[in-house]
Amino acid sequence: MAANTGIIKGNTHEWEMVVGLEVHAQVISNSKLFSGASTGFCSEPNTQVALFDVAMPGTLPVLNARCVEQAVRTSLALSCEVHKYSVFDRKNYFYPDLASGYQITQFYFPIATDGYITLDECCSKDVRISRIHLEQDAGKSMHVGDKTYLDFNRAGVALMEIVSAPDFRSPEEAAEYIKKLRIILRAIGTCDGDMENGSLRCDANVSVRKVGDSNLGARSEIKNLNSIKHLAQAIRHEACRQVEVLESGGVVSQSTMLFDVDTCTTRSMREKEDACDYRYFPDPDLLPLELTTAFIDNIRASLPELPSEKKRRYMQDIGLSRYDADILSSDKDVSAYFESVVAKHAPDLAVPWITGELFGALNKRGSSIADSPVSAGRLVELLDLVADGTISGKMAKQVFALMFETEKSASDIVREQGLCQITSEETLAPIVDRIISESPDEVAEYRQGKTKLLGYFVGKVMKETNGQANPGLVNTLIKRRLAED
């Protein structure tokens, strides 16, 4: 059986994947959705827990306005319709790390619906976002030997559940969607998008159908995928598994699956519940959430330039390639750094230094641009020295490496190392004359048409001057001298 992007070639038919994603994004907020407990990460277990978070009798939820603002901000950035009226419901189920026995969510009337994200890499399409709603996160169970320990630090942290329509037809489309969603959430400051630490988690609903069939097959839900790589692997394996079941005469059951990262396979966790199993009903302790037009408009006005808009501007106004525009618009810290540099220097000089030298050095160190020892202002200073001919491009790379290592300015390093470029014709002309007079055979060959020997003479001059001679001036002087009789 072969799988080619979203089409699986079985023994009897070609099958098409149909995938929808449910993303749980932790809201950036100082306190939880319904309590004043802190949301700080990496604290000691059970040190950030309010009485409400563990369902102590008599405690009541108090809605965090900041979390509502963040959900509206996200909804607007994803082109959703924000509803002025929404309701919090109780989703009833038992699990040890859910102390109340129910999760407060929004089932019947979510805060937003009908948005989209545009894919433009692996394909060109709009992926519909069916709904966005606010809900509580659960605590965390830790299994050690035959014991289970509960940490309620995460219990009650605000989540935005962002639910897509079943519009994906390949793992690659799903992966691109998560990348773009994460870039948007980071750009608007509503979620840090850190999948490794669980602040962005993804469930994938996967089914298959024969190519050309419009009916949807029974779906499996793969829970808690914590990397884009694992998401793509899980979707592909589960789709192929379902095809094998169907082609062998079996029936795909609606089930909840787990993805084993060691074997890259999915396995059944339990039969998937229907909505009726959760017995949703409006939470009697919370009034409906009613938003005003002014509240929504104020948040809309505060939205920053979105990454897709920034990418378009970089391509149309600055003239960047699609590739460079994509890299430089995908992170707000990178964008700010780039715009500071390009305000002083042309893009064709600034871009290679940022995407080449700077990114290369940061990757080796494992650092982000926010932690770069070479600030945008320091890089501008270095490029000033290149532009005015003080140092050559080759020298600049040496200076940059020292800047990155020592955090000194370019001017200080050039002065300390004696790296100023030699741009005086009076200084270079005698060196050129001597090298040419010492190379009669090479001069004769050059004058007979072997013009590639120009590089030989340039190299000799550069070696003589320890690489400090201005290459352009050296070329001019050598050509002029060799043209003489």
Curated annotation (Swiss-Prot):
Keywords of this entry: ATP-binding, Ligase, Nucleotide-binding, Protein biosynthesis
Question: Which reaction equation describes what this protein catalyses?
Answer: L-glutamyl-tRNA(Gln) + L-glutamine + ATP + H2O = L-glutaminyl-tRNA(Gln) + L-glutamate + ADP + phosphate + H(+); L-aspartyl-tRNA(Asn) + L-glutamine + ATP + H2O = L-asparaginyl-tRNA(Asn) + L-glutamate + ADP + phosphate + 2 H(+)
Q: Name one GO molecular function term.
A: asparaginyl-tRNA synthase (glutamine-hydrolyzing) activity
Xref: Pfam families: GatB_N, GatB_Yqey
Q: Which GO BP terms, alphabetically?
A: glutaminyl-tRNAGln biosynthesis via transamidation; translation
Which top-level group of life is the source organism from? Answer: Bacteria
Q: What is its EC number?
A: 6.3.5.-
* Protein family according to the UniProt entry: Belongs to the GatB/GatE family. GatB subfamily.
User: Which NCBIfam families does UniProt cross-reference here?
Assistant: gatB, PRK05477.1-2, PRK05477.1-4, PRK05477.1-5
Q: Give the protein's biological function.
A: Allows the formation of correctly charged Asn-tRNA(Asn) or Gln-tRNA(Gln) through the transamidation of misacylated Asp-tRNA(Asn) or Glu-tRNA(Gln) in organisms which lack either or both of asparaginyl-tRNA or glutaminyl-tRNA synthetases. The reaction takes place in the presence of glutamine and ATP through an activated phospho-Asp-tRNA(Asn) or phospho-Glu-tRNA(Gln).
Cite the record's note on assembly.
Answer: Heterotrimer of A, B and C subunits.
Name of the protein this chain belongs to: Aspartyl/glutamyl-tRNA(Asn/Gln) amidotransferase subunit B
Name of encoding gene: gatB
